[in-house]
Amino acid sequence: ILSCLVGSEMCIRDSQGSEKAFELNDQKMLRNALPDDRRYTYEIREILKLIADKESLIEIKKDYGRAIVTGFMRIEGHATAFIASDCKHLGGAVDSESADKASDFFDLCSDKNMPIVSFVDTPGFMVGPDSEKEGAVRRMSNLFKSGSKLVSPLVAIFLRKGYGLGAQALVGGSLHKPAFTAAWPTGEFGGMGSVSYTQLTLPTIPTGLI
């Protein structure tokens, strides 16, 4: 991959071989890829492997900004970049490090004119005193800045949670940015999760409500 990051915008597309040389995974397995119970986590990398052509998935920066998974893959022979939430780390919340990772990746894809598929499952941005000490406002704002400058076509796939500004940031800074948007049957949308909203609006939560 490193040898493909310098030069023409076609070099990353060519790094995974001929577009005619591909083999699909069994797409029927995607029907049961996500748990029915929204409280259960799942392995996002296994879903990505099912969607991608066989042996075409390449992940980058795996151990950095772990709430976000980034890399390249082919879909029916067509090279594309992907960015995905990892619900097993911070519940998929976008922290400062993940925001940096996503921002840098958007910049890379825009520079190389790589189409992007964004798989979203996030409760939003990680907030709180610790996050603020890490420069969250500045670093998360940079993600919106990178999204606003994105020239590559972007497709948004909402796997589960699509809440708040964090979800918008992962699809280019606006829900109107993607060229196409779709959702799994488990998709949820809103300014924040229903539990968080209830906790904010009710002084005491009736027993059994949550």
Per-segment meaning from a language model:
Residues 8, 176-200:
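Mobile "lid/hinge" segments at catalytic clefts and subdomain interfaces of large enzymes
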Residues 77-79, 112-115, 150-154, 176-178:
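Short coil/turn connectors at secondary-structure junctions
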Residues 8-9, 13, 35, 39, ...:
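Generic secondary-structure signature for well-ordered alpha-helical cores
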Residues 16-28, 66, 119-126, 159-167, ...:
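A glycine-rich phosphate-binding loop feature that marks nucleotide/adenosyl-phosphate handling sites
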